[in-house]
């Protein structure tokens, strides 16, 4: 049953190209009192008045409304919240910009309290030195203004028009969260805080680029701190099925999760994906992980590649599009992997430097063939994006991704050869621990259960390739590091196959792995790390994720 509360109106500025100033108020000043969002299913519908340019929210599920959906706040019981929103399917015809604005507005309204919790948890993980805040704000302000200027100046360009859709959705998110805050009588989040959340992945590279260190010990590097992940695409020997999965690695402070289903009725001949399901977080208009199922037939997975060549980070400038923005635009516009890569390559910010796996299920004929273009691998570093068709590799059985660049140029320019020379083969593409484990064990994947198993695998005490390191394996548990435990590592897994993807369906589990007798993670050992809104103990099962409104 939906929780109901009185709906009120809020008059927003024009949603398209809304020049919202970056508020320079310190993020920690936005009201520290903890708010409790009652668990359960919260429904809401947004109505747009063209005459008054007002949004009205009613806490009902009205399929004739301009945007409608629900938020199932089940984080404490399953590890996941579930958000589903449909926009543009109501009784009145709306512009694409208004549809995107209302979709963002409704999401902000439904998830505002967890958005603030998530910001509170992540901010100290990224901002270690308060002196960097002004530099980050200045960069983001310049980047935002440049982006909005290009959207306004190039309305007939499909790329910039779709960038405008994404920016308009962010404007809606901000104002919807603001409305919810007014109802709850709490201080609203600033636009900077919401931009900060969406740019978390980009900030992993942006902050070091703004505060370069003269020297640092490579031995102090913790692999999970940069948002590293494990991903696997597995094809059965007779092409009977194709499985794909992703396990996220980052600080456990990021374990406030929402799985999202969006269906936006955008009428633009260049929009090839109007509907998507993906793993995400409160306040994020992207996955971050990444794990997307798109209505274009594309699947997008991603793992992060660190850039150890610090001179490359000097090339990061604000007159670019952040990675999260380019991913969203490419997801909306691309029909295939090559086109996705070409769109994503435009205006490369050089931040959140990743390996993207673009799997085109339209190219797969079960029991028969994987056509050319089934799998594109896309990798980014500052000033350069490289992509290639790696379907031939996939035909041999699998593609694994584990935070080491595949393309030789990216590998070399990022500084990995020096890392191998200094620290050993654990940083080589072929002989990293996860490369060896995936190569050894991928043949055991024959069904969904075995795919889940390999992606939660951590037998660090016994596996010779782990050598006793709880992070030299598929699903890292740095909190089990006997010498220096830290609350970070692998904290989820999402798994699907070609048949499930046709229904936008996946299986997802939240929390560090407990497979083969590992103890559940408990925050009582790391209470100094902020974890507002989370369960104290993570010991959940896989949850079936599937949209129910359409």
From Swiss-Prot:
Glycosylation sites: 72, 309, 367, 412, 527
Example of a GO cellular component annotation carried by this entry: lysosome
Protein name per the record: Phospholipase B-like 1
UniProt-listed GO biological process terms: lipid catabolic process
Keyword terms, alphabetized: Disulfide bond, Glycoprotein, Hydrolase, Lipid degradation, Lipid metabolism, Lysosome, Signal
Family note: Belongs to the phospholipase B-like family.
A Pfam family matched in the record: Phospholip_B
Cross-referenced InterPro entries: PLipase_B-like, PLipase_B-like_dom1, PLipase_B-like_dom2, PLipase_B-like_dom3
Group of enzyme by EC: hydrolase
Signal peptide positions (record): 1-39
Post-translational modification, as annotated: The maturation cleavages that produces chains A and B are required to open the putative substrate binding pocket. Both chains A and B remain associated in the mature protein.
Encoding gene per record: Plbd1
Function: Exhibits weak phospholipase activity, acting on various phospholipids, including phosphatidylcholine, phosphatidylinositol, phosphatidylethanolamine and lysophospholipids. However, in view of the small size of the putative binding pocket, it has been proposed that it may act rather as an amidase or a peptidase.
UniProt subcellular location: Lysosome
GO molecular function: phospholipase activity
Main subcellular location: other
Annotated S-S bridges: 471-476, 475-490
Organism domain of life: Eukaryota
Propeptide: 210-228
Record-listed E.C. numbers: 3.1.1.-
Record note on quaternary structure: May form a homodimer, each monomer is composed of a chain A and a chain B.
């Amino acid at each position: 049953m939906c929780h109901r509360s009185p709906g009120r109106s809020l008059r927003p500025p024009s949603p398209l190209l809304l020049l919202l100033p970056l508020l320079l108020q310190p993020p920690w000043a936005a009201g520290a009192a903890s708010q409790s969002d009652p668990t359960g299913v919260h429904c809401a519908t947004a109505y747009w008045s063209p005459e008054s340019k007002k949004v009205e929210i009613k806490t009902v599920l009205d399929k004739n409304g301009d945007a409608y959906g629900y938020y199932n706040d089940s984080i404490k019981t399953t590890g996941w919240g579930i958000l589903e929103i449909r926009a543009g399917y109501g009784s009145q015809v709306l512009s694409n910009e208004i549809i995107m604005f209302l979709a963002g507005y409704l999401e902000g309204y439904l998830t505002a309290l967890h958005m603030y919790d998530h910001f509170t948890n992540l901010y100290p993980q990224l901002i270690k030195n308060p002196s960097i805040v002004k530099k980050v704000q200045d960069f983001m302000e310049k980047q935002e203004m440049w982006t909005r200027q290009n959207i306004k100046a190039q309305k007939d360009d499909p790329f910039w028009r779709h960038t405008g859709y994404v920016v308009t959705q962010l404007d809606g998110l901000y104002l919807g969260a603001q409305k919810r805050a007014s109802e709850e009588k709490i201080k609203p989040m600033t636009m900077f805080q919401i931009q900060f959340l969406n740019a978390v992945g980009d900030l992993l590279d942006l902050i070091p680029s703004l505060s370069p260190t003269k020297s640092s010990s490579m031995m102090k590097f913790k692999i999970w701190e940069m948002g590293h992940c494990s991903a696997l695409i597995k094809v059965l020997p007779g092409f009977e099925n194709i499985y794909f999965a992703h396990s996220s690695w980052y600080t456990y402070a990021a374990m406030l999760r929402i799985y999202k289903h969006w269906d936006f009725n955008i009428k633009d001949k260049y929009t090839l994906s109007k509907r998507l399901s993906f793993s995400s977080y409160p306040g994020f208009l992207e996955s971050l992980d990444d794990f997307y199922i798109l209505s274009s037939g594309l699947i997008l997975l991603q793992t992060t590649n660190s850039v150890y060549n610090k001179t490359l980070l000097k090339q990061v400038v604000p007159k670019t599009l952040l990675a999260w923005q380019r991913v969203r635009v490419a997801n909306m516009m691309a029909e295939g992997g090559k086109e996705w890569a070409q769109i994503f390559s435009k205006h490369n910010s050089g931040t959140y430097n990743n390996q993207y796996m673009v799997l085109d299920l339209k190219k797969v004929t079960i029991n028969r063939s994987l056509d050319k273009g089934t799998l594109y691998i896309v990798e980014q570093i500052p000033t350069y994006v490289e992509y290639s068709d790696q379907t031939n590799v996939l035909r041999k059985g699998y593609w694994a991704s584990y935070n080491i660049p595949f393309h030789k140029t990216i590998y070399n320019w990022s500084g990995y050869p020096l890392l191998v020379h200094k620290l050993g083969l654990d940083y080589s593409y072929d002989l990293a621990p996860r490369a060896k484990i995936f190569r050894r064990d991928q043949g055991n994947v024959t069904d969904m259960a075995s795919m889940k198993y390999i992606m939660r695998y951590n037998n660090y005490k016994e596996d010779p390739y782990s050598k006793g390191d709880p992070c030299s394996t598929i699903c890292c548990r740095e909190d089990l590091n006997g010498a220096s435990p830290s609350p970070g590592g692998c904290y989820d897994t999402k798994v699907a196959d070609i048949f499930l993807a046709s229904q936008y369906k996946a299986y997802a589990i939240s929390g560090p792995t407990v497979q083969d007798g590992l103890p559940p993670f408990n925050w009582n050992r790391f209470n100094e790390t902020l974890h507002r809104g989370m369960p104290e103990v993570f010991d959940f099962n896989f949850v079936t994720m599937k949209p129910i409104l359409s």
